[in-house]
């Protein structure tokens, strides 16, 4: 009787135990990452050939305590290696784990190699060769705390390498994990299976091998036991022959039918090649198809199981498309696959919620480093039957209400960009902005007290509802996460797409970029202030400080300003401002762009202006500015510099986003300035729900105010 260990992916241990027991294994004991079991030589070979779930089958050789590298060396050397393999064979060591004495796995592997080589040298005065590539013998050593386990790896290469897969599409599943997904899906041999995003076909091929009683290891060319002295060649041939007979008979007798599709023609060709090499090509129909065009391959029955590993994104920009994909898949399942089962494996349970289906069962497993979940659904017999769930219904209703009111208003105003929703409902803490045909959803960073997974689920619900209410293609929705700005964060790029969209605001054309920066190049809440500046600037010299992308300069120029001067510290935004001026025909020497620290420039400038617009940051500590700036603390010093630049009968429009900002009226009076708050007049209908989005003031020389 042999004592053996089968390793597997985390989460599959109990499934592997059942599989080994079905093969005839005894004394099965589940541990994290695998199963200890016992069996005779036939069972040893059968577990290698027939296990669909094991990663490796190991034959333990010794276990001992390790308090030093000498303990490791002596424990390995105590094994009679000459009885395990011949000196003419090559070997390799796989060492995992560390402790206080063995702190590096490479060092541990080196000590094990030395011990094995020295064992041969002392006994027969010859030494075997170490080979990193395709060794004849693989020795596995696992060190945990002060215990080391040494085993012979009978598998060679991992057992998931069945021998049928050549090339793979993006993000392939290991064959052993694919087999587990199939077994957990609820699918029964003899019934149909469909994978609508099949990639290289692994799920379908593993299912077809199960249906046709084909041993998963039948196509493997290399094994870890062929150079082992305990290898029984005749018994192995007998086990192989039995498996070949079963595979031929199973292929003839199976009634299962399999269907796979993918939008990528290249991976479908790979899938067909993989199925041929696996010996199950005649059972699987592959075709190139978009999920959006998915239909039931057996509309008249019988019913079967849809099994799929849909894509899940790690990049923020991919999430709207994935949400739309899952939502669409859910609708197709409900409308065309009544009576079928659905089983999806994903690293994103939040995306699975976008199906708007209730799962009957779910399982957890690891896919490499990723924590994944598999959810099984029973699809109702009637099309679009019961079992669906409404997602973010309150949010959708509010968005619908806002859209009805604001869409008509925006058209009357002659604007393409406006805010549709701004955290109206506390549980849906986002802003939704429309820019022509596109929509930007900005998630306000949730408080640390809110569960991260719950916040992510709500965000996915918001995107799902926004796409539905606005009837928007997923590629027209841009997702961003907004946090409190620190220093120069607002100037840092989020992406490198360089895609600009030309939008209209009253009589102005303006370039926006919805993807590359946190802000888009157009502050929507200042729309009315910009229009007022245009009306104030006719025949006058206009100065725009902290100008950003120069949109206020555009309105002033279109309003008939004699000149515009646009000052900002960012070259990127000045180039953007120049584009905005140029597209509106505002070119020439009378439209100046100045790259400078605005605070320093104001102190050194020796010219005057009729209209000055200044919208400084609430706080800044940019390296390019000599000192920090706080708008509450420093606004009086700011006005002192501006007073010198302001002509008689001139006007300063001063705006900022500081909540609770208090204007120092006494200080202004001492400077010889008067101020009038015009915040209410600058707030448009789409920001009526957020009265504190900004505050705005008009300042004049004392005695000139109206």
Swiss-Prot record:
THUMP domain location: 43-154
Keywords assigned by UniProt, alphabetized: Cytoplasm, Methyltransferase, RNA-binding, rRNA processing, S-adenosyl-L-methionine, Transferase
Chief location: cytoplasm
Domain of life: Bacteria
InterPro entries on file: 23SrRNA_methyltr_KL (IPR017244), DNA_methylase_N6_adenine_CS (IPR002052), RlmKL-like_Mtase (IPR000241), RlmKL-like_Mtase_CS (IPR053943), RlmL_1st (IPR054170), SAM-dep_methyl-trfase (IPR019614), SAM-dependent_MTases_sf (IPR029063), THUMP_dom (IPR004114)
Gene Ontology terms, MF aspect: 23S rRNA (guanine(2445)-N(2))-methyltransferase activity; RNA binding; rRNA (guanine-N7-)-methyltransferase activity
Subcellular location field: Cytoplasm
Signal peptide: none
Entry keyword annotation includes Transferase: yes
One Pfam short name: UPF0020
Reactions that this protein is recorded to catalyse: guanosine(2445) in 23S rRNA + S-adenosyl-L-methionine = N(2)-methylguanosine(2445) in 23S rRNA + S-adenosyl-L-homocysteine + H(+); guanosine(2069) in 23S rRNA + S-adenosyl-L-methionine = N(2)-methylguanosine(2069) in 23S rRNA + S-adenosyl-L-homocysteine + H(+)
Cellular compartments per GO CC: cytoplasm
Catalytic activity, EC: 2.1.1.173, 2.1.1.264
Family: Belongs to the methyltransferase superfamily. RlmKL family.
Matching NCBIfam families: PRK11783.1
Function text: Specifically methylates the guanine in position 2445 (m2G2445) and the guanine in position 2069 (m7G2069) of 23S rRNA.
PANTHER family registered for this protein in UniProt: RIBOSOMAL RNA LARGE SUBUNIT METHYLTRANSFERASE K/L (PTHR47313), RIBOSOMAL RNA LARGE SUBUNIT METHYLTRANSFERASE K_L (PTHR47313:SF1)
Protein name per its UniProtKB record: Ribosomal RNA large subunit methyltransferase K/L
């Amino acid at each position: 009787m042999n004592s053996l260990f089968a390793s597997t992916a985390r989460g599959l241990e109990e499934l592997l135990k059942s599989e080994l027991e079905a093969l005839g294994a005894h004394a099965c004991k589940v541990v994290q990452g695998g199963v200890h079991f016992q069996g005779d030589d036939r069972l040893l070979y059968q577990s290698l050939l027939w296990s669909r779930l094991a990663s490796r089958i190991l034959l333990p050789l010794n276990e001992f305590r390790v308090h030093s590298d000498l303990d490791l060396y002596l424990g390995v050397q105590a094994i009679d290696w000459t009885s395990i393999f011949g000196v003419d064979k090559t070997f390799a060591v796989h060492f995992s784990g560390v402790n206080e004495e063995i702190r590096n796995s490479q060092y541990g592997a080196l000590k094990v190699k030395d011990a094995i080589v020295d064992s041969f040298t002392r006994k027969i005065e010859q030494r075997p060769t170490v080979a990193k590539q395709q060794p004849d013998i693989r020795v596995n050593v696992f060190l945990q705390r002060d215990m080391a386990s040494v085993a012979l790896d009978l598998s060679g290469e991992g057992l998931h390498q069945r021998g049928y897969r050549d090339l793979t599409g993006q993000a392939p599943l290991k064959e052993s994990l694919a087999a587990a997904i199939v077994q957990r899906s609820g699918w029964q041999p003899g019934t149909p299976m469909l994978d609508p995003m099949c990639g290289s076909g692994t799920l379908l091929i593993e299912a077809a091998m199960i249906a046709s009683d084909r041993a998963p290891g039948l196509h493997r060319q290399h094994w870890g036991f062929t150079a082992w002295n305990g290898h029984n060649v005749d018994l192995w041939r007998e086990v192989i022959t039995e498996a070949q007979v079963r595979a031929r008979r199973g292929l003839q007798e199976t009634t299962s039918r399999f269907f796979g599709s993918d939008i990528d023609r290249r991976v479908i060709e790979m899938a067909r090649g993989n199925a041929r090499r696996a010996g199950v090509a005649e059972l699987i129909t592959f075709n190139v198809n978009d999920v959006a065009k998915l239909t039931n391959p057996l509309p008249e029955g019988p019913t079967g199981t849809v099994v799929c590993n849909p894509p899940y994104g790690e990049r923020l920009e991919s999430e709207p498309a994935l949400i739309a994909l899952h939502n669409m898949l859910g609708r197709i399942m409900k409308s065309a696959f009544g009576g079928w089962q659905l089983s999806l494996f994903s690293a994103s349970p939040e995306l699975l919620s976008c199906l708007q289906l209730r799962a009957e069962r779910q399982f957890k497993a690891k896919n490499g480093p990723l924590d994944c979940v598999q959810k099984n659904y029973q699809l109702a017999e009637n099309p679009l039957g019961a079992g669906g769930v409404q997602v973010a219904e309150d949010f959708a209703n509010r968005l619908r209400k806002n859209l009805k009111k604001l869409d008509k208003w925006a058209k009357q105003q002659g604007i393409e960009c406006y805010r549709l929703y701004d955290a109206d409902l506390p549980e849906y803490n986002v802003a939704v902005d429309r820019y022509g045909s596109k929509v930007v959803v900005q998630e306000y960073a949730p408080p640390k007290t809110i569960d991260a997974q719950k916040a992510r689920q709500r965000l996915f619900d918001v995107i799902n509802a926004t796409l539905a209410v606005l009837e928007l293609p997923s590629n027209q929705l841009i997702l961003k996460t907004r946090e409190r700005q620190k220093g120069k964060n607002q100037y840092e790029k989020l992406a490198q797409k360089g895609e600009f969209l030309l939008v209209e605001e009253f009589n102005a054309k303006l370039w926006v970029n919805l993807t590359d920066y946190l802000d888009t190049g157009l502050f929507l809440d200042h729309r009315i202030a910009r229009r007022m500046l245009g009306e104030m600037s006719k025949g006058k010299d206009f100065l725009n400080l902290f100008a950003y992308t120069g949109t206020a300069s555009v309105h002033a120029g279109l309003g008939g300003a004699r000149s515009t001067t646009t000052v900002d510290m960012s070259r990127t935004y000045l180039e953007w401002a120049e584009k905005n001026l140029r597209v509106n025909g505002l070119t020439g020497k009378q439209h100046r762009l100045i790259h400078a620290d605005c605070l320093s420039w104001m102190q050194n400038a020796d010219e005057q202006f009729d209209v000055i617009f200044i919208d400084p940051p609430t706080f800044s500590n940019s390296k390019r500015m000599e000192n920090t700036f706080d708008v509450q603390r420093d606004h009086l010093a700011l006005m002192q510099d501006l007073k010198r630049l302001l002509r008689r009968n001139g006007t300063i429009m001063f705006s900022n986003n500081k909540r609770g900002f208090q204007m120092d009226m006494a200080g202004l009076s001492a400077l010889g300035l008067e101020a009038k708050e015009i915040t209410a007049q600058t707030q448009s209908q789409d920001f009526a729900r957020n009265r504190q989005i900004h505050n705005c003031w008009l300042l004049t020389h004392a005695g000139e105010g109206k």
